[in-house]
Swiss-Prot record:
Signal peptide: none annotated. This is Sodium-coupled neutral amino acid transporter 5. The keyword Glycoprotein applies. Induction: Down-regulated in Dgn3 deficient mice. Residues 85-97, 157-176, 224-264, 324-341, 405-406, 468-479 are extracellular.
Length: 479
């Protein structure tokens, strides 16, 4: 999951949908290799100014790192839970499918950007459907960012009491000042709000790179703890306490399920989709790429998605093989409070998510200002009020939601399929001219099927999730 840019760059004068001259169509075909055609004005002999006439400075390797960091987010903590409810083989197959589909959707975005020279996700919405399209895309991105903020604050809610309790040698369940709900309010007021009130991100924007480093540390620790805890969990002191996860609930034979389907599967695929959302960041990274071509940026995307697939697969597999069917949606909760290695992991993750929340809040506020107050000058009162209202709403959400799985599941069933499946396919169908790709050509049929798949995925996931909530199975699952 990544930090989504909810504010677009200034776009060029839009061309009419579905129409291109013969020369422009030829330019589009050349654009399979170059980002924008380099035609010249016959009157002046000068090349027309395009937004990418400046040379990008970011290397290929750094672009891979940036996009990998955009993909990486809190969703990695829920992947072992997803594997527990699908089985090892089925999970890895689903994860591979989500990765491949994410790569294809990025291909659709890059192709659309190549046609019209736009470098922001919501500007593609305006190009395809006018101002209403831009508003819809901005709302979806804001929803996804609110979900990301909620997941980060939920991690603070569950992990900070354990960290403070360890240092103070206190029971986080027994002392009122170690309650998670109180702590997230204090962290929001004392740390997140002051950072969110800054007028510009400045160096705070670089703190998002902490997430990738912290999650690598998390992965290494999960692998190490698997071999330390071993199989005989009933005699191991490093697992969670009995009241957190009853020992009899562990798989006594330590046999992993290779393929399984249960009522909680309605959460598993959305968790995987949530973990791969990076699409609003693709076009800005494309803009900054040195020698930007569609093929080169697609290679950046493929390498980033491939690296995250490996990292996600390892984390889920070793986490599941440590705790089997008892693993929780937030895997760090499974480890004991006194484990010093896990304490270091908790501190690293807490630092990363705390500093990332204001970074996520910035584009939401900017998008709201552009949508609600497009012609208004900067106002500190409005700047502070939007940040405060957003933090209050997210805190209420985190306090009321019982598990982080519900956040992963809902966002992974709504904004994630919209950003990965539905919007890229709709953009492709609307933006790519019929002179280049006829309506019934194979690429457009593929894009149409891709969008339909996203709609079905959203409908089925939400249907099963609401059914679980209505019947109480969500609470009875024990996680």
């Amino acid at each position: 999951m990544a930090i989504s840019c909810a504010v677009g760059m200034e776009m060029q004068e839009p061309k009419m949908n579905g129409t291109l001259s013969a020369g422009a169509a030829a330019g589009y075909r050349q654009e399979r290799e170059g980002f924008l055609p380099t035609t010249r004005n016959p009157a002046t002999g000068r090349k027309p100014v395009q937004f990418l006439d400046f040379e990008g400075k970011t290397s290929f390797g750094m672009s891979v790192f940036n996009l990998s960091n955009a993909i990486m987010g809190s969703g990695i903590l829920g992947l072992a839970y997803a594997m527990a409810h699908t089985g090892v083989i089925f999970f890895l197959a689903l994860l591979l499918c989500i990765a491949l589909l994410s790569s294809y959707s990025i291909h659709l975005l890059l192709t659309c950007a190549s046609v019209v020279g736009i470098r922001a996700y919501e500007q593609l919405g305006q190009r395809a459907f006018g101002p209403a399209g831009k508003v819809v895309v901005a709302i979806i991105i804001c929803l996804h960012n609110v979900g990301a903020m909620s997941s980060y604050l939920f991690i603070i809610k569950s992990e900070l009491p354990l960290v403070i309790g360890t240092f103070l040698h206190m029971d986080p369940e027994g002392d009122w000042f170690l309650k998670g709900n109180l702590l997230i309010i204090l962290v929001s007021l004392l740390i997140i709000l002051p950072l969110a009130l800054m007028k510009h991100l400045g160096y705070l924007g670089y703190t998002s790179s902490l997430s990738l480093t912290c999650m690598l540390f998390f992965l290494i620790s999960v692998i190490y703890k698997k071999f330390q805890i071993g199989c005989d969990v009933s005699h191991n002191d490093t697992v969670v306490e009995a009241e957190q996860a009853p020992l009899q609930a562990f798989n006594s034979s330590c046999e992993a399920e290779l393929f399984t389907v249960d009522s909680q599967m309605s959460y598993t695929v959305p968790i995987m989709a949530f973990a791969f959302v990076c699409h609003p960041e693709v076009l800005p990274i494309y803009t900054e790429l040195c020698r930007p071509t569609q093929r080169r940026m697609q290679a950046v995307a493929n390498m980033s998605i491939g690296a995250m697939f490996i990292m996600y697969g390892l984390t889920a597999t070793f986490g599941y093989l440590t705790f089997y069917s008892t693993v929780k949606a937030e895997m760090l909760e499974m480890y004991t409070q006194e484990d010093m290695l896990i304490l270091c992991v908790r501190l690293a993750v807490l630092l990363a998510v705390t500093l990332t929340v204001p970074v996520v809040l910035f584009p939401i506020r900017r998008a709201l200002q552009q949508l609600l107050f497009p012609s208004k000058a900067f106002s500190w009162l409005r700047h502070v009020a939007i940040a405060l209202i957003l933090l209050i709403l997210v805190n209420i959400l985190v306090i009321c939601v019982p598990t982080i799985r519900d956040i992963f599941g809902f966002i992974g069933s709504t904004s994630a399929p919209s950003l990965i499946f539905i919007l890229p396919s709709v953009f492709y169908l609307r933006i790519v001219p019929t002179e280049v790709e006829p309506l019934f050509s194979w690429p457009k049929i593929q894009a149409l099927c891709f969008g339909v798949l996203g709609v079905l995925f959203m409908a089925i996931s939400l249907g099963f999730m609401f059914a679980n909530w209505a019947t109480g199975q969500s609470r009875m699952s024990g996680h």
